[in-house]
Amino acid sequence: MPIPLLSFPLTTQNQRVEGYEVPNEDTPTIYRLTDTSSDTEIDAIIWAAYRQIFSEHLILETYRQPYLESQLRNRAINVRDFIRGLGKSEVYRQEVAQTNSNYRLVDISFKRFLGRATYGKSEQIAWSIVIATQGLHGFIDALVDSEEYRQNFGDDIVPFQRRRFKDRPFNLVNPRYADYWRNRLLEQFLGGQSFYRVVRAGESGKRGVAGAIPSTFLSMAASIAPSGISYQRTADSARTFISTVKLPETTSESKTPPPTVKPATVALPYRYIPGNKTT
């Protein structure tokens, strides 16, 4: 028997109230599958679903799901099942689920499947328990089969960000992974050691910093060092080079006489009037 979803307090969000904004270029485009949808419209629905769930503006060929696309084109599944399949795909597991903590996975999935952010840490904790007990597939099923999803998107509408007002779109402000996964990759490339851990431990000297750098990097750097005298390595060497270098004499005297300016007659205004002295 699954653990029931924990209760959590709600917070104020734009999507919880009706909007009276005038539609403009920021108004989301609604992609809906109907019985009369053409092949071009179905293609637009498929790519809109990829952008929404995978949050990628440029969909790679390896990210595509041909089996799900074929079923949707033949009306074997609806849009809601297509969204469910994308959430359960190996692409979503590798690119989103495995690169984030359960709390951040909940927040990202809510923005992509339900079109809103979570109501706070309490809701993230409640749904992270669902991930821990039912896995990723159970979590995706719970989102797609929820009453909130059905009321806002039904079976034939691609999810979208609901009532975005002045804020940037979710896919522009939320990178695919946070510092949690970036630091983990850093530790893997550094052979299990992290420069940040070395500094926190108090070893801020050269020995502590060198301990976080693989020995292969030092040998590689030494092998590509330029040969010959490098006067830019230290300030003293640079000053010595500048003080000892002999610059050629480039000054010369010009033999051309300077130009002379002769006075010229100027027609002053009103000189044609008799008796008017203009000089």
Swiss-Prot record:
PBS-linker domain span: 11-189
TM helices/strands, residue ranges: none
A GO CC annotation given for this chain: plasma membrane-derived thylakoid membrane
Subcellular location(s) per record: Cellular thylakoid membrane
GO BP term, pick one: photosynthesis
Keywords noted in UniProt: Antenna complex, Membrane, Photosynthesis, Phycobilisome, Thylakoid
Xref: InterPro entries: PBS_linker_dom, PBS_linker_sf, Phycobilisome
Stored Gene3D superfamilies: Phycobilisome linker domain
Membrane topology note: Peripheral membrane protein
PROSITE patterns per UniProt: PBS_LINKER
Signal peptide, first to last residue: none
Function: Rod-core linker protein required for attachment of phycocyanin to allophycocyanin in cores of phycobilisomes.
Similarity annotation: Belongs to the phycobilisome linker protein family.
PANTHER family, per the entry: PHYCOBILISOME 32.1 KDA LINKER POLYPEPTIDE, PHYCOCYANIN-ASSOCIATED, ROD 2-RELATED (PTHR34011)
Quaternary structure (record): The phycobilisome is a hemidiscoidal structure that is composed of two distinct substructures: a core complex and a number of rods radiating from the core.
Name the record gives this protein: Phycobilisome rod-core linker polypeptide CpcG1
Species annotation: Mastigocladus laminosus (Fischerella sp.)
